[in-house]
Amino acid sequence: MYIVNTSFMVEPSVHDRWLKFVTEKYIPALRARGFGKVVFTRVLSVDAEDHFTYSLQVNADDMEAYRLIVDELFAEYAATAGALFGQRVLWFNS
């Protein structure tokens, strides 16, 4: 099993809209594609006073599922979120 972690840094000006998008659209889309174990948490950091930080962890049972998340689902997220929020939401996988 693999855990795919994505960290998000969200500017306050788009925070509420982005949070609604992730919780009402993106996470349900992940679950609909068969990824039942999804953990979404806010990360508190002393260095993050000017933005909100979140972590999204998705369990992938095998390398095929991992590739689906990284190659397809995150690309879909990037296209949609990029159009909605631009550079006001930064994210990276680890």
What are the functions of these language-model segments?
Residues S13, E64, E76:
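Short alpha-helical
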Residues V14-F40, A78:
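Short amphipathic alpha-helical segments
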Residues P28-G34, D62-Y66, T80-F85:
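Glycine-rich loops and low-complexity Gly/Arg-rich segments
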